[in-house]
C-alpha cells in the first residue's frame, strides 16, 4: 500500500490560494460564485463563469475609477465624489450607453447651454451688420 495517503510524519501542508489570486484579480471570485449559485440564474454554474465575471467587473470598476480620478484632478480635488463619477460616466460614450438608465445619487446634471442662448461673437456680428448696410 505504498504511495497511498499522506505520510504520517509530513507536516508540509500546502497553503490555500484563493481563486482570485490564481486569476490575478482583486475582486472576490468565491463570493461572486456564491452569489451566482444563490441567485438561481441557472441550475448549474461553470467553474470559469465567476472568474470571467469578476474580471469584467474589475475592469469596469477600474475604468470608472480612472475616469473619475481624472475628473477630480481636472476640478483640482484630491477626493472622488459622486459628481466626479457622474462627469466621468456621462462624458465617456461607451460608459454612458452602458449606464444610460442609471441615476447616480448626488451626481448632479451635465453642464449644457443651448447654442441659441450663448452670446453672439463680436467679430461675426460686426461682419453681419456691415453686410446688412450694403
UniProtKB/Swiss-Prot annotation:
Organism classification: Eukaryota, Viridiplantae, Streptophyta, Embryophyta, Tracheophyta
Any one cellular-component term (Gene Ontology): nucleosome
UniProt-listed CDD domains: HFD_H2A (cd00074)
Role played: Core component of nucleosome. Nucleosomes wrap and compact DNA into chromatin, limiting DNA accessibility to the cellular machineries which require DNA as a template. Histones thereby play a central role in transcription regulation, DNA repair, DNA replication and chromosomal stability. DNA accessibility is regulated via a complex set of post-translational modifications of histones, also called histone code, and nucleosome remodeling.
Keyword terms, alphabetized: Chromosome, DNA-binding, Nucleosome core, Nucleus
Assembly and interaction partners: The nucleosome is a histone octamer containing two molecules each of H2A, H2B, H3 and H4 assembled in one H3-H4 heterotetramer and two H2A-H2B heterodimers. The octamer wraps approximately 147 bp of DNA.
GO molecular function, one term: DNA binding
GO terms under biological process: heterochromatin formation
Matches recorded under Gene3D superfamilies: Histone, subunit A
Translocase in keyword set: no
Family named by the database record: Belongs to the histone H2A family.
Keyword Repeat: no
Protein name according to UniProt: Probable histone H2A.3
Main location: nucleus
